[in-house]
Amino acid sequence: MLIGAGERIAVPGRADMTYRFRAHSEYLYLTDRDRPGGILAFDPHDGWVDFVKPVTRDERLWEGASTEDEVGVSVVELATWLERRRDRPIACLGAPMPHLTSMDGLVADLREALNAIRRRKDEVELARMRAAESATSAGFAAIAPLIEPGRTERELQIELEAAFFRNGGDSVAFETIVGGGPNSAVLHFPPTSRPFADGDLVLVDAGAEYRGYASDITRTYPASGRFTSEQQEIYAIVRAASERATARCTPGIEWREVHRIAATTIADGLVDFGLLHGDPQSLVERGAQSVFFPHGIGHMVGLGVRDAGEVLPGREPSEDDFPRLRVDLPLEVGHVFTVEPGIYVVPALIHDAQFRERYRDAVDWERAESMLDFGGMRIENNLLITDGDPEVLTGDVPLVA
């Protein structure tokens, strides 16, 4: 078995620049080494060999790489290692190694075996995740008092990320999302110079990374300091969905059941609000809530913002049963998940002809049309599954009252 770290990727048109390197999570998990070009090899008869790429003079000149990065066996020796095993099947994990041919079935089996180990976080991993959460919490604390009409999405991003780095974060776990007003309805909106207006919702989805381990938090704020009555009603529905889904995150529960609880809570709330019509459970069976809750309830987080093997082998997503749900497995002690319900008024979905026909009797389309400038709301926390109630790792980041 070979597990590749991956190589640097050049920035197009810039001969001496590369994107920030991050080793493939499978390699990083097994070696705790974040250098390009490494290949970890395993033979059940002979054990592990860590093949590393020699540090070049240019790397020392431009990047400050040291001989400490060369601890291991030179990758030049990999050819000899492979030649001695040329009659045996190879499985290549980690970053792609197109010059080698591996057995797909063997790769799938080994990857799932590794995923099963990686899903359950040990104390070292949890310590790193808590450090990432701490930096992220500091970032959200820094921006909360700054949110006001006239402030821009970009300004918030700058202050948030600066606080991440001041408080121990190594990098951002993913591209920071800040959307104000109608932009808050775009699930992954990149910040712009748009200033917040009076009455806007401001959605911030961000996280720091520490030694490869990620945090992923979302909060939604009123730009004016207080929600309007309409915004407060929707926020209460999202918060109820978050609390009920969180309470259900216990060992043995199927993730799709957690999603179902959140979806039903949202459907129930939107019936009372007047955007949906009908029995909440029947609406969820039809998927009507997805007009306003168009994503899954969450995902695994850990070594990267989307962690290991979120769908068990043999389970295929069903187009008839939560088609947007990307996680399908039972919860176990040591798993870490995001729980992130939201409600959005997305013009593209409100104007979608197929949705209009499919849910013509389930959605108050006229009411939805009147809310096209509403934007969106999401609450996202990171949960550690324990023997008892789940531990909210992101509990230091306050919700809006």
Predicted regions, residues:
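Active-site neighborhoods and metal-handling regions in enzymes and metal-associated proteins
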Residues: 1-401
